[in-house]
Regions:
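Short, conserved loop/helix-junction motifs that constitute active-site signature segments
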Residues: 64-67, 101-102, 121-127
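Electropositive, gly/pro-rich neighborhoods at or near active sites that engage anionic ligands
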Residues: 1-58, 63
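Histidine/lysine/aspartate-rich catalytic loop segments that bind and position anionic ligands
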Residues: 56-91
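Structural motif
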Residues: 50, 105-106
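Short acidic low-complexity segments
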Residues: 90-102
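Short His-Asn-centered micro-motif
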Residues: 54-56, 74-76, 93, 109-112, ...
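C-terminal functional extensions of proteins
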Residues: 118-154
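Residues at the starts of beta-strands that form the adenosine-phosphate
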Residues: 50, 69-72, 128
Length: 154
């Protein structure tokens, strides 16, 4: 909980200073529209590549699995691991991480990795890595991470 409060404070201060943007989560049809924008981006930039999604975000997963050739998904939630959801078998984010990263050409990580401490696992993989969502807004700016967030579009 303390990490979440710190991340929220960083985002609020940095947004109020105009240093980062898109710090408010999408509502209503926003997540579905985000998934559509994400697939447009990946079709244009990473069509034939192996895509590893880190974190369970249904709209993004369902859009990428339906439109891209090779997608794997990692998550830490035991309620998701081992089940097929949104067109993908959700793999254990701890046990399958090393092999999944080796397999991937590109990695798409939830911004929640900054809260649960797994962000560091994806910083120096040697793979093109994007972080998505609003949670990571301030941290992405501070660490100069590639961030995909379509909140301003949706």
């Amino acid at each position: 909980q303390a990490a979440g409060l710190m991340i929220a404070a960083i985002n609020a201060v940095m947004a109020s200073l105009g240093i980062c943007d898109r710090t408010i989560h999408c509502k209503n049809e926003g997540p579905a529209l985000c998934g559509i924008e994400m697939i447009k981006y990946f079709k244009e930039n990473h069509y034939d590549e192996n895509i590893l999604i880190v974190g369970y975000q249904p709209s993004i997963i369902s859009n990428l699995t339906a439109n891209m050739k090779n997608v794997r998904v990692l998550d830490l939630n035991p309620d998701n691991i081992g089940y097929e959801k949104c067109g993908a078998i959700i793999e254990d984010g701890e046990r399958a991480m090393k092999g999944a990263v080796e397999w991937a050409d590109v990695i798409l990580c939830t911004g929640s990795t900054v809260c649960n401490g797994t962000l560091v696992d994806y910083l120096d993989t040697g793979k093109k890595t994007y972080f998505f969502g609003t949670t990571l807004a301030g941290t992405a700016k501070l660490l100069d991470l590639d961030r995909l967030c379509f909140a301003d579009i949706v």
